A protein has these predicted regions:
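Structural preference for beta-strand elements that scaffold enzyme active sites
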Residues: 4-8, 47-48, 75-81, 109-112, ...
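Active-site mouth loops of central-metabolism enzymes
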Residues: 18-32, 82-92, 117
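N-terminal binding-site loop/beta-alpha segment at the start of enzyme catalytic domains
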Residues: 1-76, 303, 314
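Short beta-strand segments at enzyme active-site cores
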Residues: 48-52, 111-114, 252-254
Length: 314
């Protein structure tokens, strides 16, 4: 695997369509809007881009690929996913979806290829092996898998000399199930990179939204988070104080906390003004006392941000 930066950039909100940026995030972003973001990020050393076929049913990959094609392939790290729930019942469903991604990106390999949701570990994990052997994918990961599923996936791959190189799960101050289930410890013990998505809880942990300034109405994230924003007030107030002491932002505090947990955060950036802020977050350190305070306040919010697509991690 290529050397990974401290932070990945996520493109779930790029493009429109089913499971796309308009429906989930309330965004209506096209390539012209996002090209400056991509270029600014690459200049800043953020070259790890996370996407999935299911994001807009190919729309996110389509937009991202228009930018990656303009760069030396070795300078870009492409992370995309196979989603069993949209794959159909063909024996070669994974290879078909992988080939479609390769075609969109105009490349002959994907750096990190993920099984997006477990569905059936015994059925889908073996399908990664021919992709690894052919070189179509350089490394593989599993997303939204619990500890037992992760261990079983590793056993299946190990029989052919391969391994799960990365895990990608929802992980934030408000949702620490992967830590509670022992997945973070397992990753440390097995030299597996843990990618944390929704570190900012789709904007709810940025301090930019409140009851008076809610997330976009009619969007998936608005439906999920607007009703719980008042419960986050004490947590956000503590994060704001920590940020002010460092001349930082609340978002940076959330990202710094995730990095301190030995995770690689995936941050969705849609505006150039947030690139420098995201890069700088990797240089911020929290004391153990500060982290403990935030975790305690987060637990006291009583909110549950578990997505409908997730199952228990234990």
């Amino acid at each position: 695997m290529k050397k990974l930066p401290a932070i990945a950039l996520g493109t779930w909100s790029w493009g429109m369509g089913a499971a796309g940026g308009d429906r989930v995030f309330g965004n209506h972003l096209e390539a012209a809007d996002l090209k400056p973001v991509f270029e600014e990020a690459m200049k800043a050393g953020l070259n790890l881009w996370d996407t999935a076929t299911v994001y807009g049913m190919g729309a996110s990959e389509d937009i991202l690929s228009t930018f990656t094609k303009q760069y030396n392939r070795e300078d870009v790290i492409i992370s995309t996913k196979f989603t069993p729930q949209i794959a159909g019942m063909y024996g070669d469903s994974m290879e078909r979806m992988c080939d479609a991604s390769l075609q969109r990106f105009g490349t002959d390999y994907i750096d990190i290829y993920w099984i997006h949701n477990p569905a059936d570990v015994e059925r889908w994990t073996p399908c990664l092996i021919p992709l690894l052997k052919s070189g179509k994918v350089k490394s593989v990961g599993v997303s939204n898998h619990n500890l037992a599923e992760l261990k079983r996936a590793n056993e299946i791959l190990a029989a052919e000399g391969f391994r799960v190189s990365a895990v990608q799960n929802h992980f934030s101050l408000l949702y620490r199930s992967s830590e509670e289930a022992g997945i973070l410890d397992y990753c440390k013990e097995n030299d597996t990179t843990f990618f944390a998505y929704m570190v900012l809880e789709q904007g709810a942990l940025t301090g930019r939204y409140s009851s008076n300034n809610p997330l976009p109405e009619g969007s998936g994230r608005g439906e999920t988070y607007n009703k719980i924003l008042p419960q986050l007030d004490l947590l956000l107030a503590a994060m704001r104080l920590m940020a002010e002491r460092r001349k930082a932002t609340i978002s940076q505090i959330a990202i710094a906390w995730a990095i301190a947990k030995h995770t690689l955060p995936i941050i969705g950036v849609t505006k150039t003004k947030y690139i420098a802020e995201t890069v700088a977050a990797a240089s911020i350190s929290l004391t153990s006392e500060e982290s403990a305070l935030l975790e305690n306040l987060a637990a006291k919010t009583g909110v549950d941000t578990k997505g409908s697509w997730k199952h228990p991690m234990i």
